[in-house]
Amino acid sequence: MSSNECFKCGRSGHWARECPTGGGRGRGMRSRGRGGFTSDRGFQFVSSSLPDICYRCGESGHLAKDCDLQEDACYNCGRGGHIAKDCKEPKREREQCCYNCGKPGHLARDCDHADEQKCYSCGEFGHIQKDCTKVKCYRCGETGHVAINCSKTSEVNCYRCGESGHLARECTIEATA
């Protein structure tokens, strides 16, 4: 998610505190402890190895900002115009995933990896990120090299004004604070 998108709905043009989707923590993520996050739909995200889930249509493989749907869809029936709690269709059962390892078929309390450390860089168990031997590039997300040696160019965004092409230290807009 880029710095100029709402944390709740993934759309640009407003911040989470001004989100038109309303109440509470909306459809964003809430902290789960142990370094992972759980979406309001019950999906847990503990590493980049888990699939992307779109919060607009509920499908995997893309995020809401890349979704073809113009309006949010009901997570139960997939149609627009209402949300799952107001859906008239029978509730569709979904397989829950373990909050620890992200795999279906068991709960976190029954997970074989419950007491193991998980690396947030490679997603493997048994070590933490600072001890990981698989270096990961923060520019392209691939393993095997670091950002300074990355051949892929990336668009830089200014944290002050949100525009691309320059950094905050190069920004011509006055800081307001």
Swiss-Prot record:
ZnF locations on chain (CCHC-type): 4-21, 52-69, 72-89, 96-113, 117-134, 135-152, 156-173
Source species, domain of life: Eukaryota
Sites bearing N-acetylserine, chain numbering: S2
Keyword annotations of the record: Acetylation, Cytoplasm, DNA-binding, Endoplasmic reticulum, Metal-binding, Methylation, Nucleus, Phosphoprotein, Repeat, Repressor, Transcription, Transcription regulation, Zinc, Zinc-finger
Region RNA-binding Arg/Gly-rich region (RGG-box), residue ranges: 25-38
Modified residues (Phosphoserine): S49
GO molecular function, one term: mRNA binding
Alphabetical list of SMART domains matching this protein: ZnF_C2HC
UniProt subcellular location: Nucleus; Cytoplasm; Endoplasmic reticulum
PTM per Swiss-Prot/TrEMBL: Arginine methylation by PRMT1 in the Arg/Gly-rich region impedes RNA binding.
Cellular component terms (Gene Ontology): cytoplasm; cytosol; endoplasmic reticulum
Modified residue annotations for Omega-N-methylarginine: R25, R27, R79
Pfam families given in the database record: zf-CCHC
Modified residues (N6-acetyllysine): K8
Single GO BP term: positive regulation of cytoplasmic translation
Role: Single-stranded DNA-binding protein that preferentially binds to the sterol regulatory element (SRE) sequence 5'-GTGCGGTG-3', and thereby mediates transcriptional repression. Has a role as transactivator of the Myc promoter. Binds single-stranded RNA in a sequence-specific manner.
Assembly with partners or alone: Associates with the 40S ribosomal subunit, the 80S ribosome and with polysomes.
Recorded disease: Dystrophia myotonica 2: A multisystem disease characterized by the association of proximal muscle weakness with myotonia, cardiac manifestations and cataract. Additional features can include hyperhidrosis, testicular atrophy, insulin resistance and diabetes and central nervous system anomalies in rare cases.
Protein's UniProt name: CCHC-type zinc finger nucleic acid binding protein
The organism of origin for this protein: Homo sapiens (Human)
